[in-house]
Amino acid sequence: MKPTTTPVRTILFIAAALFITAGFSRATGFDWENLQSDIHGVGELTDQNVVNPWGIAHSASETIFVVDNGAGVATEYFEDGRTAPSFANPHIITIPRSVVNTEGANPTGVVWNSTSSFGVSNGTSTLPAKLIFVSEDGMISGWNPNLNNTHAFRAVDRGATGAIYKGVATGVTNSHNFLYVTNFHAGHVETYNENFVLQATGFPFADSNIPAGYAPFGIRNFNGNVIVTYAKQDADREDDVPCPGCGFIDVFNTHGQLLRRLVSQGHLNAPWGLEIANGQLWVGNFGDGRINVYDAGNGSFLGTPRDVFNIPLQFDGLWGLFGDDGFVYFTAGIADEEHGIFGVIF
């Protein structure tokens, strides 16, 4: 952790203005803060649940939810990194595990749902999930505070099929809401309707030019452009294989039709995190921890964010990227995913 004497909230407020006005034309001079970590002294604050954090979602009340793969929970934070609603009373959501999972839950991706679709039940009542989680054990679950403030509920369990979910996004097609989930083991993007029913046809999400041995990994929907990253699979098709030049990025519409190949290999290395910052696409590599920036339209490489010493920003085990109010928040599963960081770039 870089020592600071100025309160984090003050630093971030000033830095946000610089980020917004400068954008990536300021290729150097970026900085960051580790807001939370499970290791005392690594973050400004310590949260024992920040173990291999992946997905990041922004709520309607301007708080941030971070999914902790290693702890099987999601935690709510204020934008300055403090736990919400208070340090003494953090809001922690327990994620359910698949029936075939004999260990703990292992959530990865998350998306905020502001629609009236995607209902989940606590056994008595059914309400739209505000947060939708996907997990490596093939579980899709949803949370609504009016069902249970501290527990998500099962929506779909495909653990018995061998499904391994790494990412999730939502989209609208023909005035209906759909859920898109990257099944890394099966090597395709699954589509679910607004009632969590798997769509067998009609959403191909296919690219015949992706080499064998690669599978959909990360996914985000930016204004109807569904961006999917591809990573190399290991022999069991369970995890990614980090290696330089190993990765592809495609753009689909919400029907799952391929619009274009955006990026092929090059600087990619098991890419997962995605964000649009100042109109440019930021891509986070899990493989080498670096962030690469591309033209969001034609995929041309624009550079890598660097610090004041011209050193590329690099975060061991980099997972999620999420931009908000001039910041780019990130998560990382440091020390071979045994520990974690939730931080912010400015």
Regions found by a protein language model. Give the residues of each.
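Bacterial N-terminal signal peptides that target proteins for export
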Residues: K2-L12
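Bacterial N-terminal signal peptides
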Residues: I11-A22
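Residues at the start of alpha-helices and the adjacent loop-to-helix junctions
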Residues: P7-V8, F19, L45
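Sequence/structural signature of beta-propeller domains
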Residues: R26-F346
